[in-house]
Amino acid sequence: IAFCLCLIGDAVINLFMVFSAVCYFVAHCVFVRCYFYFRKPKFWQFVVWIVVFACICIFIQFVKVSSLLKIFGVLYTFAMTAMVMFSFGIPKQLMIGSIIFFVSDILMLRNFIYSETVVSHFFSLGSYYVAVMLIAVKIFFGFGEEVCESK
């Protein structure tokens, strides 16, 4: 489901940015839910998530964009940071994919807020596709013995 939402978001990003962003937001939430299936989150993950989320929200307040974009940025950051924080402790390939996905999202938001260059666009899309491939390969080809740590 999350990959389909990412695909839909990719397909319509130039036509309907808000709809595309909603697709990505829901995809991040679906990934987080899947990560909970593989490993119950630890208390420290919640603490780190809240701290990172708060720091990014503070930074968002200093960006010169409309209030609506700031609200959207906070909501999107909520899902992005959750995906990264709750990826710790699950198979490393998923964790690395989640971190790269986060970086690609930050680059995409930067490109959206400021004028994008060919280089920044290349790094944004390049890191996005690497992240999606890392996650997809691990999900589609199985987990072996790594699944469901309950510690």
For each feature predicted by the language model, list its residue ranges:
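Polytopic alpha-helical membrane-helix bundles and their juxtamembrane interface segments
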Residues: I1-K151
